[in-house]
Amino acid sequence: PQWLQECDGAYSLDPDLALYRGRQYTPLDKPLFGLFSDSCPDRWGRLLMRRREAIQARKEDRKPRKLTESDFLLGVFDGSRMGALRFSLEEGGPFLSNDPAFATPPWVKLRTLEHASLAFENDDSGLNEQWLQQLLAPGSSLGGARPKASVLAADGSLWIAKFPSKNDEYNSGAWEMVVHELAKLCGLHVPEAKLETFSKTGSTFLVKRFDRKVSQRIHFASAMTLLGKTDGASAADGTSYLDLASFIRSNGANPTEDLRELWKRIVFNMAVSNTDDHLRNHGFLLTPTGWALSPLYDVNPVPEGNCLSLNVNEEDNSIDISLVLEVAGYFGLTEQESEAAATEICHTVQENWEKIAQKYGLSRGAVERMRGAFIEE
């Protein structure tokens, strides 16, 4: 290919894939190269695909086939696949999984999609084809465990809708919106978001896709892929924010700005007890000059949380602001700058979280149950 003939200007999309011709093999601990794993569905999308196979097997009077990683990768609808990868069998040929019959639904279908997701969850047989067909195309392309779907806004922009689940202990959508607004108040880089409520089950959190710009696709890669890690990499095996910082220093399009942003995100994660800050929940967008830290996403408060998923320094993941202050220099902040920034973020969260929760209709009881997530410093 031409890009391999011009290796002087080439860049790696995956540390496990070298820039040379010929067959390459995945590491033993990876079913797919991370480059492709980022385009695969996670638990919700895989559940939908497995249910589809079960329905098809029942119709054909056979045993359901065990789906492979390639099935999951190529079963994702092309129009809403994460990032910029597209697949075809031949150069210039039609893209796979691009059937117009499964096009991303419009915004006005949100209520129907939420109803379908709840009905699908509550269907004990797991074989209701009506609900599956509603959800498969818009929901199979997305990661995470929550019921979700891609939808198109009136202006043509692509959004992710995260629906309430029967398994929710609290209104997850509303609390994600609260934390999103807090992050914006703290000056962090966040995508556009909205909250809709269609039922008593809970709220639907909507966030604009940041890997699309009008009709242009922007390549996205998770930190898990770019660090050469596997699912489950965490503080337990020594994975830390310092690893992310090292990657930004070496490969970042805006290293100074992104290092500061990442450091502030650590403080914010502590301030709201976001303990799900694993490597899949940090991402980068490919630019002509390198990798840029993506907008903040998938941040949720956890009232009983006391540790982050990643270490702050090389060996400690405790929710303790003193830890993040100790490593501030590695992210390019002076002692004075880091103390001022941490104080400002924690103060902003403490001063505003209850007011924002009330704004989005969360009850006093719900606020009290979540109080433990918002640390006081």
Regions found by a protein language model. Give the residues of each.
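Phosphate/dinucleotide-binding and metal-coordinating scaffold of catalytic cores
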Residues: 1-279, 283-377
